[in-house]
Amino acid sequence: MNKKKILKFICSAVLSFTLFSGYKSYAWDGKVDGTGTHALIVTQAVEILKNDVISTSPLSVKENFKILESNLKKLQRGSTYPDYDPKAYALYQDHFWDPDTDNNFTKDSKWYLAYGINETGESQLRKLFALAKDEWKKGNYEQATWLLGQGLHYFGDFHTPYHPSNVTAVDSAGHTKFETYVEGKKDSYKLHTAGANSVKEFYPTTLQNTNLDNWITEYSRGWAKKAKNMYYAHATMSHSWKDWEIAATETMHNVQIGSAGIIYRFLNEVSGTINTTENSKINEIMVVIKTANEDKAGTDHYIHFGIEAKDGKKYEWTLDNPGNDFEKNQEDSYRINLKDNKLTLQDIAKTWIRKERGAGVRDDWKPEYVKVIINSDVKYQANINEWFGDNKTFYINNK
């Protein structure tokens, strides 16, 4: 939606500073061709799993691991893509996550005076895990692996000490310098196993919490806190090269082992070895909408997502991110916070998206698909590929 929001001067100044000074706002280095630190992390995570635990895993997990391994290049490319997504936020706001505040730097940094972004590295991981799981179960293994790689990118981001501390390249030159330091030595940090006792002491812990949504958050929080603590202990610009080497070694080892844990949980989820549970009360809804890749498919009109409960009560939210959403060939994601609501999964009778009647010139819209994620699971989805005129409502109650 081209709402032509004017960001405040400070944001423009910061963006100019970031771009023209050569600083990067993203975390571990990664190349568009699926190489660099991010790709090394996921590659080693797969090797760690193969060396540690796959041989003793259930047959279904072994088979799914073989599929994943055969799509390793997709995993690698996915792991670097978020830094090159042309439609991403200019300052990579959603790559940050402070595990103590649950915010990215747009909520925690005093210098950032523009529009707050409610997506974080942690929420992106949950979203992409759900999307990858959904595609895998459909047999779309390449797409699923690519999406999982993207999720692992965000998981990797909050292992670099600066990201979980919400310290950007604007806050400290150390942000980029530390990442460059690690990139130059990345091969020296390679791991090939999570440890001699990992089969008994680590991997089982990744399956104990059957509530997937809660597990992703708390598993991520544990690792992110380690990285944040490492920032203050060894990784600021005031620390020595010896300190930086301590921080680099610790965080790079952690992210490889942690990523192996994410992949192991994913393989068990899609293999059906976990009796997954979920919260009845809905705390958050994520809505993912792709606008068709056709001429004039985008719209400037408002789009809404709605729910009707079985008691007849209706809820509706405007889907509106900072910047331009619902543009041609663009996928947009929205987080709807329901923590103060008493709505449960069992209450839902209908879900929909609705295009509002706009003032003035007619501006039709053609969505390609919509997916609704609750509890790290795609609950409702639909392939649409229809033109929406004024005030059109589309119901999306199919799984």
Swiss-Prot record:
Its cofactor is Ca(2+); Zn(2+). Ca(2+) 1 binds at G298, D363. This is Phospholipase C. The protein is composed of 2 domains; the N-terminal domain contains the phospholipase C active site (PLC), in a cleft which is also occupied by the 3 zinc ions. The C-terminal domain is a putative phospholipid-recognition domain, which shows structural homology with phospholipid-binding C2-like domains from a range of eukaryotic proteins. The ability to bind membrane phospholipids in a Ca(2+) dependent manner and toxicity is conferred by this C-terminal domain, which also contributes to the sphingomyelinase activity. Zn(2+) 1 binds at W28, H38, D157. PROSITE patterns: PLAT, PROKAR_ZN_DEPEND_PLPC_1, PROKAR_ZN_DEPEND_PLPC_2. GO terms for cellular component: extracellular region. GO terms for molecular function: phosphatidylcholine phospholipase C activity; toxin activity; zinc ion binding. Binds 3 Ca(2+) ions. Binds 3 Zn(2+) ions. Belongs to the bacterial zinc-metallophospholipase C family. Pfam families: PLAT, Zn_dep_PLPC. The gene is plc. Residues 29-277 form the Zn-dependent PLC domain. Coiled coil: none annotated. It catalyses: a 1,2-diacyl-sn-glycero-3-phosphocholine + H2O = phosphocholine + a 1,2-diacyl-sn-glycerol + H(+). Keywords: Calcium, Cytolysis, Hemolysis, Hydrolase, Metal-binding, Secreted, Signal, Toxin, Virulence, Zinc. Ca(2+) 3 binds at T299, D300, N324, D325. Zn(2+) 3 binds at D83, H95, H153, D157. Its EC number is 3.1.4.3. GO terms for biological process: killing of cells of another organism. It comes from the Bacteria. It is found in: Secreted. Zn(2+) 2 binds at H163, H175, E179.
